[in-house]
Amino acid sequence: MIPGEIITPSGAIEINVGRDTLRISVANTGDRPIQVGSHYHFYEVNQALEFQRELTKGTHLNIPAGTSVRFEPGDTKEVELVTIAGTEEIYGFNGLINGSLKGKKKKK
């Protein structure tokens, strides 16, 4: 092994295996592009993005870490979201949750 070397298993690496997903349509109603990163709590994204927001509590984009999706003005895209793993506690972002999601999620 070389110092700093990373040895990965052979074959494809699957992300978010076994986690609940949701597909939704998202429209950018604003006049500027909006980019959403892979780990951003989707419920708290820019208000110019129009979608069924209540359904997205506790989810983020189901895309590889470090990537993002860009919504141009007037664009409508279908995206796949995945549940956030862990303790179901969300802090930061736009400060809309700042605590536990338990009891705050709306059923699909």
UniProtKB/Swiss-Prot annotation:
Gene3D superfamilies: Urease, beta subunit. One of its GO terms (molecular function) is urease activity. The keyword Cytoplasm applies. Transmembrane segments: none annotated. Pathway: Nitrogen metabolism; urea degradation; CO(2) and NH(3) from urea (urease route): step 1/1. It is found in: Cytoplasm. GO terms for biological process: urea catabolic process. It catalyses: urea + 2 H2O + H(+) = hydrogencarbonate + 2 NH4(+). It comes from the Bacteria. Its EC number is 3.5.1.5. GO terms for cellular component: urease complex. Belongs to the urease beta subunit family. Heterotrimer of UreA (gamma), UreB (beta) and UreC (alpha) subunits. Three heterotrimers associate to form the active enzyme. PANTHER family: UREASE (PTHR33569:SF1). This is Urease subunit beta. The gene is ureB.
